[in-house]
Amino acid sequence: MTSRPSSDQTWQPIDGRVALIAPASAIATDVLEATLRQLEVHGVDYHLGRHVEARYRYLAGTVEQRLEDLHNAFDMPDITAVWCLRGGYGCGQLLPGLDWGRLQAASPRPLIGFSDISVLLSAFHRHGLPAIHGPVATGLGLSPLSAPREQQERLASLASVSRLLAGIDHELPVQHLGGHKQRVEGALIGGNLTALACMAGTLGGLHAPAGSILVLEDVGEPYYRLERSLWQLLESIDARQLGAICLGSFTDCPRKEVAHSLERIFGEYAAAIEVPLYHHLPSGHGAQNRAWPYGKTAVLEGNRLRW
C-alpha cells in the first residue's frame, strides 16, 4: 500500500504579492469574497485582477479582458506567483494572444492552477516559464466538505501551494500499477485529460519532451469519453517516448455497466506503448490535490514521486 500525502495544513509565508486572475470560467461573487477573506486570514498579500468579476457568457470576461489581467500580472515587479481563481473552460482561447516575450521578461513567477488551467501550464512549460499544478485559489472560498477527513485533505492541498512556493515539499506518494518498476526520471507534465486532449492539433497541444512523466486526472466523465480522450492525447504526441504515466483521481467518473475498470483501460494503452503506469497520485478534482511543479525534472522510484 502507498503512504498518504502529508496532511499538514500549515501555511508557509509567501514573500511578495500573489496576483489573482480568472483566465477561464466566471466566478460566483460569494465564493470570490470568501476566498479573499481566507487569503487575508493566511496573511497572503494579493493583487486582484481588474476583470476577475467580469462576465461574458459563462466566461470570466472576454478574451481581451482575460488576456489583460494575465499580462498585467507579469508586468508588476513585486508579484511572487500568479494564482488562477478557477478553471472550467476558456484557457485555450488565450493562447493566440499571449505575448510570450512580455511574460518571459518578467522576474520568474509560477502560474498556479489545474483543470482547464492545464492548457496554460503546458504552454508555459513549452516557453520555459515556471508553473505549478495545484488547487485554484477559490478552493479557499468553497463551503466545507461534509466529511471531516476530506475537508482536512482539501485544506492540506491548499496549504501545499504555499509549501511548494517555500521549497518545503519535494515528493508525493504513488503506487505502481503496470509495466517495469525501474527508476524513471523526466519532466512532470500533464493535468486534466479532457482539457489536454481537446488541444490536440492546435498551438496548445501538449508539450511532451522525451522521458516525461505524464500525470492525468479528470472529473465527471464516463469511461468511454475518458478512453476517447486518452487515445486522442496519446496519438497527438510521441507517446512511446514517455517515461511513465501517472494517474491522479478520476472524480465522479461513472463506470455504469462497463466490464473493465478504469485502471485496466489505462493499463491496456500503457502496455501497448511499453510505458510504466502508476496511480493513486493525490492530484485532481477530489479532496486530495497536492501541488507539484509543472515541467520540473522528477524521479519515480518505488512508491514515491520526488522532485
From Swiss-Prot:
Keywords: Carboxypeptidase, Cell shape, Cell wall biogenesis/degradation, Cytoplasm, Hydrolase, Peptidoglycan synthesis, Protease, Serine protease. Disulfide bonds: none annotated. InterPro entries: Carboxypeptidase_A_C_sf, Class_I_gatase-like, LdcA_N, Peptidase_S66_N, Peptidase_S66C, S66_fam. The active site is at S115, E217, H285. It catalyses: N-acetyl-D-glucosaminyl-N-acetylmuramoyl-L-alanyl-meso-2,6-diaminoheptanedioyl-D-alanine + H2O = N-acetyl-D-glucosaminyl-N-acetylmuramoyl-L-alanyl-meso-2,6-diaminoheptanedioate + D-alanine. The keyword tRNA processing does not apply. Its EC number is 3.4.17.13. Pfam families: Peptidase_S66, Peptidase_S66C. The keyword Transcription regulation does not apply. It comes from the Bacteria. Belongs to the peptidase S66 family. Releases the terminal D-alanine residue from the cytoplasmic disaccharide-tetrapeptide GlcNAc-MurNAc-L-Ala-gamma-D-Glu-meso-Dap-D-Ala, which is a murein turnover product. Probably also act on free tetrapetide. May be involved in murein recycling. Homodimer. This is Murein tetrapeptide carboxypeptidase. It comes from Pseudomonas aeruginosa (strain ATCC 15692 / DSM 22644 / CIP 104116 / JCM 14847 / LMG 12228 / 1C / PRS 101 / PAO1).
